[in-house]
C-alpha cells in the first residue's frame, strides 16, 4: 500500500508553488495592465485628434496654430481642452479665453497651482529612471473626466497619462506622447517644429530622448519607453 505525502512534503510543495507564483504573478499583472493602458492611450489619442479638428471647425474660432511652442498658444490649448471637457486645469482658461488669441504665459501669471504634471522624480522611464519636466510647462496640464491627464509640453508635444496620478506613472506603460506639427491638423510623432528636432521632452535637456521613425520600436522594447507611443498607434 502506497503511503500518502507527509506533512513536510506538502509544505515543501506549497512553498515551491508560492515562490513560483510570487515570481510570475507580478509579470502577469503588469502584462494585463499594459494591455489596458494601451487601449486607453488609443482612446485618448482618438479623442485628442477629434478635439483638435473640432476647434478648427467651431464657428469663427478657427485657430492659426503656427507658433512653435504651446506656451505661445495658450488660448488654443484651452479651446482644445474644453472640447475634452476637462475637470481641472493648471492654467486659468476662463481668463485666458476672454482675452482672446494667446496671452504670453512667460510674462503674465495665469497659472493655477492646484493642477500640475507629475513632480520631478515621481514619474519614470521604462528603465525605472526618475524623470523631470521643464518647470515652465508643469501647469499646462488638464485633468479629464476619465481621470486621465494631458500636458501641453515643450514645443508642440502633448504628454498623456492615461490614468492620471495613479501608478505606475511610467513612460511606455501609462505615459505617452503625441505631436501636432505646425499648421497641420493631424497628430503624429515626428515633426515637432519648423526645423528638425526628433527629441521628446526636449526642453529638459538631460531628459530629452531622440525618437525617430527608425528607432521607436527598439526604444519601446529596450529603451526609455517613449517609442511605445508611435508603436501602439502606427503598428
Language model features with spans:
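N-terminal single-pass transmembrane signal-anchor helix
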Residues: 2-33
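Short, Lys/Arg-rich amphipathic alpha-helical interaction segments
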Residues: 6, 36, 58-60
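Aliphatic-rich helix starts adjacent to a transmembrane/signal segment
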Residues: 25-48, 52
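Alpha-helix exit/C-cap motif
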Residues: 49-68
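Intrinsically disordered, low-complexity regions enriched in Pro/Ser/Thr/Gly and acidic residues
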Residues: 69-235
Amino acid at each position: 500500500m502506497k503511503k500518502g505525502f507527509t506533512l513536510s512534503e506538502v509544505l515543501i510543495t506549497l512553498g515551491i508553488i508560492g515562490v513560483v507564483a510570487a515570481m510570475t504573478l507580478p509579470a502577469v499583472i503588469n502584462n494585463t495592465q499594459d494591455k489596458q493602458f494601451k487601449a486607453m492611450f488609443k482612446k485618448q489619442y482618438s479623442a485628442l485628434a477629434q478635439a483638435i479638428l473640432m476647434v478648427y471647425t467651431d464657428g469663427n474660432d478657427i485657430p492659426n496654430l503656427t507658433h512653435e511652442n504651446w506656451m505661445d498658444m495658450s488660448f488654443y490649448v484651452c479651446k482644445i481642452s474644453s472640447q475634452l471637457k476637462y475637470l481641472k486645469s493648471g492654467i486659468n482658461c476662463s481668463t485666458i479665453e476672454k482675452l482672446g488669441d494667446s496671452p504670453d504665459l512667460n510674462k503674465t501669471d495665469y497659472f493655477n497651482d492646484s493642477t500640475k504634471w507629475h513632480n520631478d522624480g515621481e514619474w519614470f522611464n521604462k528603465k525605472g529612471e526618475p524623470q523631470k519636466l521643464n518647470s515652465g510647462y508643469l501647469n499646462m496640464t488638464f485633468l479629464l473626466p476619465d481621470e486621465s491627464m494631458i500636458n501641453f509640453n515643450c514645443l508642440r508635444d502633448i504628454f498623456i497619462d492615461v490614468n492620471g496620478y495613479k501608478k505606475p506613472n511610467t513612460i511606455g506603460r501609462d505615459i505617452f506622447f503625441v505631436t501636432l506639427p505646425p499648421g497641420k491638423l493631424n497628430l503624429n510623432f515626428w515633426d515637432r517644429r519648423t526645423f528638425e528636432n526628433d527629441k521628446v521632452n526636449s526642453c529638459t535637456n538631460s531628459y530629452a530622448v531622440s525618437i525617430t521613425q527608425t528607432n521607436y520600436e527598439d526604444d519601446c522594447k529596450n529603451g526609455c519607453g517613449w517609442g511605445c507611443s508611435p508603436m501602439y498607434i502606427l503598428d
